[in-house]
Every structure is written in C-alpha cells, then in structure tokens.
Design a protein with these regions (language model features):
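Short, solvent-exposed beta-strand/turn "edge" segments of beta-rich domains on protein surfaces
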Residues: 71-77, 94, 140-142
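Acidic-leaning, charged glycine-interspersed low-complexity segments
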Residues: 100, 106-161
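"Short basic amphipathic alpha-helical interaction patches in structured regions
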Residues: 60-65, 96-104, 120-121
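Long protein-protein interaction modules used by eukaryotic assembly/scaffold proteins
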Residues: 1, 81-83, 91-94, 101-107, ...
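Short, cationic low-complexity segments
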Residues: 69-77, 166-177
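Oligomerization/assembly interface segments of phage tail-like spikes and tubes
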Residues: 74-91, 103, 146-155
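Small/polar-rich, solvent-exposed N-terminal microdomains that initiate assembly or binding
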Residues: 1-64
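A broadly used, surface-exposed interaction patch
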Residues: 55-86
Length: 177
C-alpha cells in the first residue's frame, strides 16, 4: 500500500506541475534520492524517509463484536504515518529551476492537503525539521543536498483482519435448581 500511496501522489503532483512545465517525460517520480552521484533525473523525486506508528488514536481492544452476540479476538489495525521527502533533484547548472519546481510543489501541497487512494482518505502536511535533522537525513541519503521539503502523510491503516479466537457472549442466564 505504501507504494500505491506514493505513486498516486507523485502522479497527481506530476499532473499539477505539467500545467507550468511542458516535459513529455514528466517532472515527478517516486524514487531513491542520492543513489548515484552521476544520476540526476532533473525531476521532483518523492522518497520515503520513515514509517512511524500513529499513537494519537489510543490503544484498541483486541476483542471485536461481530454480530448476533458473537465476538472475535482480532488484532487492531496498525495505524501509520509516512514521512516523505520531496526533493528537486537537478544538476548544479539548473539550481534556479529546482527552486522554482520546489516552490510549485509546495503550492501543490498547500492546495491539495487531502487525497484518496482505493477508497481510503489521506492527508499530507509539511513538517518542520531542524537543520541538524535535515543534515542527518541528507547524510543517510548519500550526502548530496538538493532543495527539498519533508512532509507527513497521515492515516495509513494496515489491517490483516486475522481472527485469533471467536465465541459467543452469554445470553440469558440459565439457573438450574
């Protein structure tokens, strides 16, 4: 599902950017940043930085009612957030163009904070990170810095729907004398 979400978002971003820049091969793609120094796709690259568990929803009980007084022991869904980086990966001679592309990408993020993939709604927002954290991220990605923004995609839910036990709740008490 992570691939579908990032691919869909990159496709929507590419469609938006194509209004301003006319490139038949497109301007947004999902990919690794800093994978090779000689590789400069001259595009806005959408890359996964981190997956984190969403904890604000609280802890759900593993017992779920499934109807007719029956219950099932099911693990609650895993709620996740995706931290992504949107980086304008251009060669040095096109630095000004990369800044323009980053500005247009931020306009897209601001104008489209919600999107739907396969019937599930997601939100995206920019994340503030310190200069030190940004430096650490770029060091992990290979050391080459590109103009970029870090965003968080919220509300990814992974549910295996595995039932570990089932049974019935008691109905009317039966008293034998």
């Amino acid at each position: 599902m992570i691939r579908k979400i990032l691919t869909y978002y990159a496709e929507q971003l590419d469609e938006y950017l194509s209004r301003f820049y006319h490139r038949p091969e497109g301007l947004a793609t999902v990919g690794m940043i800093g994978s090779a120094k000689e590789e400069r796709p001259n595009k806005m690259v959408v890359a996964l930085l981190n997956v984190e568990r969403e904890t604000s929803g609280g802890i759900s009980t593993p017992i779920q009612r499934i109807g007719d007084g029956r219950y099932a022991r099911m693990q609650p869904p895993l709620l996740l957030n995706l931290n992504i980086m949107l980086a304008a990966v251009f060669d040095e001679r096109q630095y000004a163009k990369s800044l323009s592309l980053l500005s247009d990408t931020m306009q897209f993020i601001q104008s489209m904070p919600k999107f739907t993939v396969e019937g599930m709604d997601y939100t995206i927002e920019m994340v503030n990170i310190s200069t030190q954290d940004m430096n650490n991220a770029w060091m992990l990605l290979g050391g080459q810095y590109y103009p970029s923004a870090v965003c968080k995609i919220r509300r990814l839910s992974i549910d295996g729907e595995s039932i570990t036990a089932s049974g019935r709740t008691s109905g009317k008490p039966v008293i034998k004398m």
